[in-house]
Structures are given as structure tokens and as C-alpha cells.
From Swiss-Prot:
It comes from Streptococcus mutans serotype c (strain ATCC 700610 / UA159). It holds the Pfam family Ribosomal_L27. The gene is rpmA. It comes from the Bacteria. PROSITE patterns: RIBOSOMAL_L27. Belongs to the bacterial ribosomal protein bL27 family. The keyword Ribosomal protein applies. This is Large ribosomal subunit protein bL27.
């Protein structure tokens, strides 16, 4: 009688398993920066500049919100100006009628 040895058949992966990473995501952008240009006409309440902290300071007829957003208090023309040697400010000057 002929005895056959049955081979022990084992299957292995032909590609390595995909590892995990702690990267691969990013936060949504906050859309900060200028929302009105120098010389542009704006209405009262218009947002002029969105920022974190005070990169630009409020000037004439400009208010500062709780999140440091600068907004126009009156209708007029936007002007970005220097405030001293190293600071900047934005002002809104009413249009003469």
C-alpha cells in the first residue's frame, strides 16, 4: 500500500497589511484677513478685518468685536493707516454729501 504525505498547506498574505498613522487630518481654515479693501465704500456694520488678537487696531468709526473682528460703525470709505512706527489701524471716513 502506497502512503502519501499530504503537505501542510499554509497561505500567507502577498501584501503587507496597511499600518495606521496619527497624521492625515487638518482643521478647517478660519477665513481670517481683510474683508474690505483700502478705498472701498462700506455700510455700517460691515466686517472690515477678521483676526486673532490685534494685528490691526480700530481707528475712527471702527469697532472691535469680542473675537477681535473689526467692523464699520458708519457708512463711508475704508482707509488702512499706520499707527505710530510699528502698528496699523483701519478707519472709516464718512462720505461728504
Amino acid at each position: 500500500m502506497l502512503k502519501m504525505n499530504l503537505a501542510n498547506l499554509q497561505l500567507f498574505a502577498h501584501k503587507k497589511g496597511g499600518g495606521s498613522t496619527s497624521n492625515g487630518r487638518d482643521s478647517e481654515s478660519k477665513r481670517l484677513g481683510a474683508k474690505a479693501a483700502d478705498g472701498q465704500t462700506v455700510t455700517g456694520g460691515s466686517i472690515l478685518y477678521r483676526q486673532r488678537g490685534t494685528h490691526i487696531y480700530p481707528g475712527a468709526n471702527v469697532g472691535r468685536g469680542g473675537d477681535d473682528t473689526l467692523f464699520a460703525k458708519v457708512e463711508g470709505v475704508v482707509r488702512f493707516e499706520r499707527k505710530g512706527r510699528d502698528k496699523k489701524q483701519v478707519s472709516v471716513y464718512p462720505i461728504a454729501k
